[in-house]
Amino acid sequence: YQTQKLPLFFGYTNTNDNGKIGPVFTHYLRLTSEVDSEGFPNSDHLYEFENIFKTFCYRKKITYNRILRSAINFTTHQPDDTKTYIHCDHDFPHKQFLMYLNNFDGGSTFFYDNNEKVIYKSTPMKYNVIMSDGELHSQGYCAPQQYRVALVVTYV
């Protein structure tokens, strides 16, 4: 991927336990539609990145019906926070695909049970993929002078 050709839009994650807001730059490939419906295409880069997901699913024999949302998330080091707020991407059953698109230190993805106890912590590495059943999750921030880029696809 070439970030110089991929427009990123500034936004915030929701607040975490301390009420602080974590900045994030996002390229929205597919926007969320109605509950459980395929999302709306939003980017000229949609097919390029969603084909990564589709190829992975084909090779691993993973079936899916439709893509709900897809995005490229770009975050940097945040000295006042260690991770983003704990959240679930949708309020209905779904699955999640996350692929790290670069190497960096820190910035793990954490998955939680319903009591917000960590049940899994990823080790980020370029092109590593995490598939989940839509569990609660959060992300850590990368080390100073680094950035974290991830492709996220939610689907059913």
Language model: regions and residue ranges:
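Short catalytic/ligand-binding loop motif for oxyanion handling, primarily in non-cytosolic enzymes
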Residues: 17-20, 78-84, 138-141
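Extracellular-facing segments of soluble proteins and assemblies that are Gly/Ser/Thr-biased and enriched
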Residues: 65-74
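Catalytic core of Fe(II)/2-oxoglutarate
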Residues: 72, 91-92, 103-156
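Conserved short histidine dyad/triad with adjacent acidic residue
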Residues: 73-91
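Short, charged/polar surface micro-motifs in flexible loops or helix N-caps
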Residues: 77-80, 102-106
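Catalytic nucleophile-His microenvironment captured as a short glycine-rich beta-strand/loop
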Residues: 96-101
